[in-house]
Amino acid sequence: MEEFQGYLELYRSQQHDFLYPLIFREYIYALAHDRGLNRSVLLDNVGYDKKSSLLIIKRLISRMYQQNHFIISLNDSNQNKFLGYNKNLYSQMISEGFAVIVEIPFSLRLVSSLEETETVKSYNLRSIHSIFPFFEDKFPHLNYASDVLIPYPIHLEILVQTLRYCVKDPSSLHLLRLFLHEYYNWNTLITPKKSIFAKSNQRLFLLLYNSYVCEYESILLFLRNQSNHLRLTSSGILFERIRFYEKIKYPVEEVFANDFPATLWFFKDPFIQYVRYQGKSILASKDTPLLMNKWKYYLVHFWQCHFYVWSQPGRIHINQLSKHSFDFLGYLSSIRPNISVVRSQLLENSFLMDNAMKKLDTLFPIIPMIGSLAKVKFCNTSGHPISKSSWADSSDSDIIDRFVRIGGNLSHYYSGSSKKKSLYRIKYILRLSCVKTLARKHKSTVRTFLKRLGPKLLDEFFTEEEQIFSLLFPRTSSTLKRFYRGRIWYLDILCINDLVNHE
């Protein structure tokens, strides 16, 4: 946030929400370049930093003043040169610049909210693991949950229109629309595997997609928080009203504005909970399956009428929490009864009472994880470790460090698993794969290599927490056993490792 402060002050001194001139400022591209050098593991660098220079930026800006030079025909191949450089390089530079500019209103809003609430910077609130304590607190009291896959917008124009609420500058939106139209196929379906979500343009399109999801959630949660009288109203009334307004081509915003009190009758549920990460969300409720089905068909109609996105009801699955597990953030979670026996004594009579309580059970998904390890050649599909041949040319310390880092990341992320036996199996696969890789490099057998190296190699795979507890307590102590059985949620995990994100 510190890197934005100077530009935010400059932006505040100018006309409100007037972002268009910033696209012609060199410092915007310099800022995008600096952020590219320090980007997270989810936004890998693909060569932009190696090829960019201040001279290229100046030439690009001078040509952008002339529309004929700025517009590049889609009929040209990707290898056609623009000012002597690859077209993809300029596409990436402009998209990075757009991302920085469009982020300015959001950064201003965040800074002002922090100043008003006097909130101290807390990265714990952004941790992925912070979702699971919420599950532990709320979900044991709920009965049904819906797995909702948020559909991608079918047209790029929908992504641009979602920015109009926070970016009041029409020129910026028109320029963004022109850029998207010229560099990408306007009528292409947007999916994560398409080129439009390539790593070179990920920051811009993640921003556009998050704006789209933010608008969807803002309307959904507003209706949830302000609603009344659900059980007095039939769901068919709402659907017929939506279809009527759709036929006469009224915007859905006017539907909510003109007939808002009647619409809200549909949504009342004081026990509903909503959680989302990326494109997957969970809607859980304590009420009956009828209510969950109403929410299901409302979401389908809402996407169709407001975002013009076709979504099938089959994409939303409703399950009973006590009988089905739900897959979220790499964990298989379920609600299980935890029965404790309490002995009570009344005068001379004593009796036993079974006290049943529900608790959240989070399991390590062993089968998908073995599939992920097999995909990157750490083991075969049955889970038998194999050598990583592509790493055999690296130094011994490099090979060990890579395996230890992967094992540490998995142990760190899956520390909240209720049963860690499956996690230990994955760590065993990584250890043996590491030994086989080293043995292959030195043209030796695994047994001979282990005898020569000793047990110190395997000690590298213990996590920092395991090493500390091993020093403080003997292996047979009850404290260490509770550590291995207990769940630990970390509030410093901001992204998911590629091996973890196996969905």
UniProtKB/Swiss-Prot annotation:
GO biological process: mRNA processing; RNA splicing; tRNA processing
Domain of life: Eukaryota
Keyword terms, alphabetized: Chloroplast, mRNA processing, Plastid, RNA-binding, tRNA processing
GO cellular component: chloroplast
MF (Gene Ontology): RNA binding
Entry annotated with the keyword RNA-binding: yes
Subcellular location: Plastid, Chloroplast
Family: Belongs to the intron maturase 2 family. MatK subfamily.
Role played: Usually encoded in the trnK tRNA gene intron. Probably assists in splicing its own and other chloroplast group II introns.
Protein name: Maturase K
Organism for this UniProt entry: Rosa gigantea
